[in-house]
Amino acid sequence: MSERNDPPREGDEPAGAVAGVADEPGTAAHGGGVAIRDDGGDRPGDGAPQEPSGTNEPPESPGHPDDPDDPDARPDARPDADADPDTEDPRHPQPPTPDDRPHATRAGAPAADASAPAQAGEGAGDPAVPLTEDADPRPGTGKLTGTAEHLIARERQRAESRSRRAAGAALVLVGGVILAVAAFTTPWRVLAAGAPAVAPDPARDFSGAQIARAQAFDAATTLPGYISLGLTVLFAGLLVLTPFAAKVLGVLRGPWWVRVLLGVVVLTAITEVLRWPLGMWFETILRDYGLSTQDWAGWTADRLKNTGVSVLLTAVMLLALVALARRVRRWWIPAAVGAFALTLGVSYVYPVVFEPLFNDFTSMPQGSLRSELLAMAERDGVPVEDVLVADASRRTTALNAYVSGFGATRRIVVYDTLLKAPESEVELVVAHELGHAKHADVLDGTLLGGLLAAFGAIGLFLLVGPLRRRTGIASVADPRAIGVLMGLMTLASLVSDPAQNLITRHVEARADVHALDLTRDPATFVAMQKRLAITNISDLSPDAVEYVLYASHPSSPERIALARSWARLNGVPEP
């Protein structure tokens, strides 16, 4: 449950978790890739800038003669016969096509452009030789006629076309599955048809001073949020449309996998250096409004831990992707399967592997509240062995709760700050989280996220090819390609966020209705929403554009209006 629709703040909830009772500001982020999230929550601002550099240049060979893992570093090595026909192996440039290769001259005469020698096809294993129209075509001569070279080039183009058509068909298929899953699992209507409509009205439930404070906080945080968003788009564009990343990463040496790891570290480090001032700016605002309790040492430690998690997850993805591109002809097939599996795996282990890096968790103390919560879960038919309390007060004054994981790792967590609220309001919050658990919202969201990841892997295959010349890379097998991949992933996240937020707003509304059905106490629900909105300084009247693009939860006035509509529908006194 959330009462905010503000610019993203670092780490509102753990990755893989269904958004909780509040998108509180100022907690540790857990993003991946190169996105800047200096201010978690529901406002613009994913991604980080990285400086532009360079102009378009022809691809440089990424191979290194001292690379012991590079087959071409050894004189007797043969190219990989399984190389993807859709992309040039960085170790074996493709021969020029009939339109761009030097025109053949008389027998034995050198080609007109000695700087672009024709080579045998990728995987052919033949030495590069000048080709002439009457070169010796006999077996064993190591030479091809111009006609033979032309046939090889045409066959390669046909194979590339077939591969791209297959990938395009797969992209359409996966996209259709995504739409079907989203349509089937999203609760587009959370109240029965004919439920009395109630219009949200901030002035009915909040004082003028509270509304003014929320507006002032929104204005203060919007500027860094939009600057962050703009820098994200700018940096991702530099990675995708210029040879900046290829030049920066081209100086790295070592086996290909070492260069990939170092490349992720280098690009992430550039991102962090550039986004650090934005993070400090936002943290200062949180302190000014009393939402942050951290000192600068704690804030720095959280950022460094978040960066480490980001580097780890990004490196795993890109190492797998580059390895597949170097070994498998149609690498996008196992890449899509792997992306789906990785998403499920990370969501499953996140509560027990990554969340403890940012908070300490203890069982809720014995007492009437714990007993009532466990009894409520039993009545709801949701098996819950424990309710955990996170030590969020060392970082924030905001109130929140969330459910994360699925299966054996599923758990319900409340912030220790929430325990200061009346027990009846805490029960409403946990009832909301039980709604997420009962409807398997984390699992549904994870499955949808996995399908989106698979869709993205196929999309990378189709997009990287046209960008090779512009970005100065040879193929996805080139370790320098990770810059393009990180940029594309960042842009894909920005483009898909509005659709994902639309879905989560409906999911959160269904969890609200579940809490009302379970407790049948709309008055306490409204009181709890007011407390959350005032404590967390929620945006009570979010801008329409920001709401559509960035709000992952309904606004507090919308949720209060929903409770009143539920009360009218069920014949309960309207709060």
Question: Where are the regions a protein language model picked out?
Answer:
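Actinobacteria-biased recognition of intrinsically disordered, low-complexity terminal regions
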Residues: 1-167, 176-179, 572-575
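Polar-ligand-bearing catalytic/cofactor-coordination segments
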Residues: 144, 150-171, 180-242, 247-475, ...
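N-terminal signal-anchor/signal peptide hydrophobic helix marking the start
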Residues: 476-485
